A protein has these predicted regions:
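Terminal leader/tail segments of proteins
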Residues: 1-132
Length: 132
């Protein structure tokens, strides 16, 4: 990831220069199911992978466009977290399901603008996240 030249640069890259984030189109159809219902279905997911000094530090996370998520199945919560590379995350619970199962970087740092208007799901809080 190259340093930002915009107005909202990620501070994490200065503090942790060995950390990298790669994003690319998933290239496959992604579906998320919960209680047997498809709650997200897209051919436009972004795969995000984080590494530190060349070693992967977390599983790939798929960010799905909001337009491809059944937003009426989600309830926004007050939970927030901060990532020095991506920005502030907002969370959603699944209706009649686990709390804070979904997150979104609604105003991500410049370097992560590709995940704006997208949602990610915790795999252990849904039935499946599958690629077809």
């Amino acid at each position: 990831m190259k340093p930002s030249t915009g107005n909202n640069p990620a501070p994490g890259y200065k503090k942790y220069p060995g950390h990298s984030i790669t994003t690319k189109p998933a290239g496959v159809r992604m579906r998320v199911t919960f209680k047997g219902e498809v709650i997200a279905d897209t051919k436009d997911a972004i795969a995000l992978e984080e590494a530190m000094s060349g070693s992967t530090v977390a599983p790939v996370v798929y960010y799905i466009p909001r337009k491809d998520v059944k937003m009426d199945r989600l309830v926004r919560t007050g939970h927030r977290t901060h990532c020095p590379f991506k920005g502030d995350a907002s969370y959603f619970s699944l209706k009649n399901g686990p709390e804070n199962a979904v997150w979104s970087y609604e105003q991500p740092y410049d370097e992560m603008s590709v995940i704006k208007d997208r949602l990610a799901f915790y795999p252990d809080k849904v039935d499946s996240i599958s690629a077809a």
